[in-house]
Regions:
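Fold-independent oxyanion-binding glycine-rich loops
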Residues: 8, 14-15, 33-34, 63, ...
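Structural motif
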Residues: 9, 28-29, 58, 85-88, ...
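Glycine-rich phosphate-binding loop
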Residues: 87-97, 255, 260-269
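Gly/Pro-rich interdomain helix-loop hinge
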Residues: 267-290
Length: 290
């Protein structure tokens, strides 16, 4: 027997960020990263949409790349004080991953980080809040996956937390958020998406449900990543969808040794910060050859 899990709703297309105003609740925490969403005006849009829907909004800003256990704990404390019924995470993989882990500690304050390391060992979530994810990069696909990557810098270990409980309830895949993405990020996140799709397709857990998603994602990345890098906005839109398809595939088929090594590299060389997608791009051809 196998399981295939996706978010309840996936909104896609230009302007679909507006769907935030249709979330039903009274309080929302909005988790973001280093400031790009604020500079581009999307943070204000998101706040206004949530308020238009009748929600009080609390902001958690400044989630760093490769978020730490400490960042997760600080965010969970804010949530415990505010008591939201929606957690909305907007940005690259880091703020969304961090918010997923915060979610667990918000609902279960006595849980320890060590309790979450065991794959598929999370407690039952949605006792207090639901989760909406809005990606601003075209690579991690954490908006549709059962994974969250958190780094313990004290031990130098990057933990891929895994549980279907942390699959978001709602994913909002709006290509307008990636139109201003720097070309290096386009390249790194695009290679992350390609690696997701390839590893899902050759995974020992691949199946008839995941294969079409993985293959379509591979074809789309090959077709659109070069043009996306060259700032073709139509190609960036298609890359945003391709990475989401790859996420649907690997969330259910899982990944392989490329990602295992890339996670270790990101934690071991944290001071120099090797971007995750860059590490994937380095390892992928050697693993394929192997």
């Amino acid at each position: 027997m196998a399981r295939f899990t996706l978010p309840r709703d996936i909104y896609h297309g230009k302007g679909c960020l507006e769907e935030l105003k249709n979330l039903k609740g009274t309080k929302a925490v909005l988790v973001v990263g280093g400031g790009s969403m604020k500079r581009q005006g999307f943070l204000d849009k998101a706040i206004n949409y949530l308020k238009e829907g009748g929600m009080e909004v609390q902001l958690i800003e400044g989630v760093e790349p490769d978020p730490s256990v400490e960042t997760v704990m600080k965010g969970a404390k804010v949530m415990q004080e505010f008591q939201p019924d929606w957690i909305v995470a907007m940005g690259g993989g880091s703020p969304i991953d961090a918010a997923k882990a915060m979610w667990a500690f918000y609902e279960y304050p006595n849980t320890k980080f060590e309790d979450l390391i065991t794959p598929f060992g999370f407690p039952e979530l949605r006792q207090k809040a639901k989760f909406a994810a809005i990606p601003s990069t075209s690579g991690t696909a954490t908006e549709v996956t059962a994974f969250s990557v958190i780094t313990d810098y004290n031990t130098g270990i990057k933990y891929p937390l895994a549980d279907f409980n942390i699959t978001p309830d709602v994913a909002i895949v709006d290509p307008e958020l990636v139109e201003g993405l720097p070309v290096k990020q386009v390249a790194y996140t695009g290679m992350d998406a390609l690696t997701h799709a390839i590893e899902a397709y050759v995974s020992t857990l691949h199946c008839s449900y995941t294969d079409p998603l993985a293959l379509q994602a591979i074809e789309m990345v090959l077709a659109y990543l070069p043009s996306s890098y060259n700032k073709n906005m139509a190609a960036r839109e298609q890359m945003h969808y391709a990475q989401c398809l790859a996420g649907m595939a690997f969330s259910n088929a899982l990944l392989g040794i490329v990602h295992s090594m890339a996670h270790k590299t990101g934690a071991a060389f944290s001071t120099g910060h090797i971007p995750h997608g860059c590490a994937n791009a380095i390892y992928l051809p050697y693993v394929i050859r192997y």
